[in-house]
UniProtKB/Swiss-Prot annotation:
Gene3D superfamilies in UniProt: 2.40.50.100
Description of post-translational modifications: The N-terminus is cleaved by ribosomal processing cysteine protease Prp.
Record propeptide residues: 1-12
Family per similarity comment: Belongs to the bacterial ribosomal protein bL27 family.
Coiled coil ranges: none
Keyword Hydrolase: no
Gene: rpmA
PANTHER family, per database record: LARGE RIBOSOMAL SUBUNIT PROTEIN BL27M, RIBOSOMAL PROTEIN L27
Name of the protein: Large ribosomal subunit protein bL27
Gene Ontology cellular component terms for the protein in this record: cytosolic large ribosomal subunit
GO BP of this protein: translation
Pfam families: Ribosomal_L27
Keywords associated with the record: Ribonucleoprotein, Ribosomal protein
Amino acid sequence: MLKMTLNNLQLFAHKKGGGSTSNGRDSQAKRLGAKAADGQTVTGGSILYRQRGTHIYPGVNVGRGGDDTLFAKVEGVVRFERKGRDKKQVSVYPIAK
C-alpha cells in the first residue's frame, strides 16, 4: 500500500516562476535645450540652442545646423527675442569696440 501512494505523489512548486516583462528599457537623454543664456557673450561657432525641429528660429548672426542646432556666426551678446506673435528667435549682436 505504501509503495502505491509514493507512485501517485505529485510535488508542486512552492514559489511561482520569475516571469518576464516587456518594460525595463529607457533611451539616453539627448541633452537638448539652451546652451547659452540671454545676455551671455559667445564666440563665433558657439552652440546656442540644441533642438529637434524649430522651437526657436535663427535670428541675426545665427545659423541653423543640419540637426536644427542654432549656433553663433560672430562673436557677440546673445539675445532671445520674440518673432511675431507666437514664435521665438535667438540673435547674436556684435560688441561695439
